[in-house]
Regions:
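Acidic, glycine-rich active-site loops and adjacent beta-strand->loop/helix elements
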Residues: 85-90, 112-113, 138-144, 190-192, ...
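Short, high-confidence coil segments that cap the C-terminus of an alpha-helix
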Residues: 79, 130-131, 229, 301
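Active-site-proximal alpha-helical scaffold in enzymes
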Residues: 109-137, 175, 279-300
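Short, well-ordered amphipathic alpha-helical segments that serve as non-catalytic structural scaffolds
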Residues: 57-73, 119-121, 206-221, 287-292
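Conserved beta-ketoacyl condensing-enzyme motif
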Residues: 19, 53-112, 228-243, 247
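Short acidic, glycine/serine/threonine-rich loops at helix termini
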Residues: 30-32, 93-95, 145-150, 243-245, ...
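Internal helical hairpin/lid segments
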Residues: 233-253, 257-292
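Condensing-enzyme catalytic core mediating Claisen C-C bond formation in acyl metabolism
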Residues: 1-54, 152-216, 221-224, 256-273, ...
Length: 340
């Protein structure tokens, strides 16, 4: 075993799995945002060349994997397993994307935390010796998510100021034993935190306590503090959730000066009218695999704490008046193996 258990939640990888290659695919709005130049491909329309939005999302996830394989000089046969998921019922974005690749597949659901969850699982599989190369990937699509979780698009419902825009995007990260980095040195499993928020148009407020809980676990278990990281990035808390998270830490006397959120990075909120920012599995996946890991390889950041969050709701639970459980999984990326 090339890993050490630090607590119930956190493990340290003694021989850190590294990023062999990664790729990000984005929709048209995402491509027009501040990070548009960092994506490997940008779709021309919401159907991504297919007949339905769901098929289009699956195509984006398949394209992300295909591009990552090409960039890494790999074939599908080189990958021992892939961990993938999305927001759709039965994970059809992932399953339909992967059905022609013939790679052993683990379906994962963590809502918008899925990129972090799949990375942690892929790194653990490699450290445990069951895989030499493993892929982690996910996707989301504005139109498919709106139809499943909210209302039909032709209805034209008014969006709340706290609402976030589900990103049309996908990302894939291929990890392996032989890599030039960045490396995943630690992974922290999140636990469900539910503070009773029932407003499904304010998921940032529902997820922020989970991010707070997981980040505290990271600092406690690894003996680090926020200043030990060049950048701390949550996934999709948006403007509302990010403010709540920084306030929770402020009340404990901790400043998150080097903190940002993928939902704030993906769009220009004012010019693109994105209200509280971006969300969706594909938001953090595209930002990580298109922008953050590229920045690490270029030397912009040496140590990065990536902590995507998820709102574990369903239309049924919301209609029944249930509150929204939140989850956050975290992984630590390091530019070199020496930072373990």
């Amino acid at each position: 075993m090339n890993m050490k258990r630090l607590s119930r939640q956190t493990c340290r990888f003694l021989q850190p799995p590294g990023v062999i290659s990664c790729a990000a695919v984005a929709g048209r709005l995402e491509g027009a945002g501040p990070l548009g130049g960092h994506f490997d491909a940008v779709a021309e329309d919401s159907f991504c060349g297919r007949k339905t939005w769901e098929q289009g999302e699956a195509q984006m996830q398949a394209d992300a994997l295909r591009l990552a394989l090409q960039k890494g000089g790999l074939t599908a046969e080189d990958v021992d397993c892939v961990f993938a998921g999305d927001l759709l019922n039965q994970n059809i974005g992932a399953t339909f994307a992967l059905r022609d690749f013939h790679i052993p597949f683990y379906g994962v659901y963590g809502a918008c935390s899925t990129m972090g969850e799949t990375l942690a699982l892929a790194a653990t599989a490699i450290a445990g010796g069951s895989a030499a190369i493993a892929a982690a990937q996910t996707s989301s699509h504005f139109c498919t998510a709106e139809r499943q979780y909210r209302s039909p698009l032709p209805y034209g419902s008014q969006r709340s100021p706290t609402a976030q825009w589900t990103a049309t995007a996908a990302g894939c990260c291929i990890l392996g034993v032989q890599s030039e980095g960045p490396y995943i040195t630690h992974a922290t499993r999140g636990q469900i935190v539910d503070m009773g928020v029932t407003d499904m148009t304010n998921m940032g407020a529902a997820m922020a306590p989970a991010a707070f809980d997981t980040l505290r676990a990271v600092f406690r278990d690894t003996g680090t503090s926020p200043k030990d990281y060049d950048l701390i990035v949550t996934g999709d808390l948006g403007a509302v959730g990010s403010d709540i998270l920084t306030e929770l830490f402020r009340r404990e006397g901790t400043a998150l000066d080097n903190y940002t959120d993928c939902g704030l990075l993906l769009y220009d909120r004012k010019k693109q009218d994105m209200h509280a920012g971006g969300s969706g599995c594909g938001c953090s996946a595209a930002v990580l695999n298109g922008y953050l890991l590229e920045g690490m390889r270029q030397g912009r950041w040496r140590r990065l704490l990536f902590a995507p969050t998820g709102a574990l709701l369903s239309p049924t639970s919301s209609f029944q008046g249930e509150s929204i459980p939140g989850i956050c999984h975290a992984v630590i990326f390091s530019r070199t193996k020496e930072d373990t």
